[in-house]
Amino acid sequence: MTSASIARQYRKLAEDYSEKTCDNSYHIPYQCHDFSMRGMSSLESSVWSGMGHLLYFKGTDTIPAIIGIEQFYEPAPKSYPIGTSIPATEHSVMSSHGLDDKKTFEFLLDLYPTGIFSVVSDTYDFWKVVSKVLPELKDRILSRDGKLVIRPDSGDPVDIICGTVSLHHHSHVQALKSGRIYYRDEDGTIKKAVRGENGLEILEDDRTPEQKGLIECLWETFGGTVNSKGFKVLDSHIGAIYGDSITLERAEHILSSLRSKGFASSNIVFGVGSYTYQYNTRDTLGFAVKSTHRIAKDGSEYFIFKDPKTDNGVKKSAKGMVKVVLTEQGYELVDKLKSTDDFSDDEMKVVFKDGTAYPTSFESVLDRANNSL
């Protein structure tokens, strides 16, 4: 439940920036990819957590979570994808081919002539890959029936993706602390400017790849389109994913920075790892299980609760039978109920009772989850 609630926040973030910068939301189910399995405490914990992620996203490398859903929920139609993944390299694959990054990329392009695949690209020199290797392979990449996804895996995520020189989408001129001035012309191209006798004199852009960031460099090499909201969308043959040190706050910073640079949020995918899904306790979201009601042998009903006088109210628990009802303000808890009260409006459904499971379909769970966004 905790992982599902966290995934929900990532989904809301993706929805928010898609609404601001994109023409459609097709990318959202795949914008946050579950990278957490290798950092979880056990196979079992990765399954439970991964199932929560799959409530809001379909991209996952925690494949056992898909099996878990098939095991614990009613079977989904074979045409219904619970979760998906793609071929992706890691550092030992890249270093096994020697120091020549171009040869490694050529090998991978031969290995995967079609479809989507991801390549970790910072094993040796990330900015060399971005500024030299990829431009040299541009024609091969653009002629593929599929997408090559570039994955940086070190450095400051915001700087790597968005660059270290910030130029706002709606301001034409910005002076940096270094004294340099940059100008964005009408088609979005960044150029250096200097102050002359007749005002600003526009020069060529002298920013380094590091200053531009990955997304802008990919745009310069591969191009793309400008959507109806005025934001740039990379060519469909190239993309980017970042999965190192991603948090909800950092993901928001990246999406905000891309927006300020004039790029749609669909240009980046986040790998959400075990720091997000493992580094939690029952207190992260205040989650606990309590007994609140009992029926004695003679049929008498008793409220079970605690309300310590030495507490500030945090440990005070619900009492009696409880239900959750849907109101105009959202879901609300109703307590102090007895077994004879009306529970027809209770949103909580029995899934396990007295040793018997009452399975539901994963599709219905997805519908409830997404309708609550």
Regions found by a protein language model. Name each.
Residues M1-S228, L248-R250:
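Buried, small/hydrophobic-residue-enriched core segments of structured protein domains
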Residues T62, G68, E74-A76, H97-D100, ...:
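Gly/Ser/Thr/Ala-enriched C-terminal appendages of enzymes
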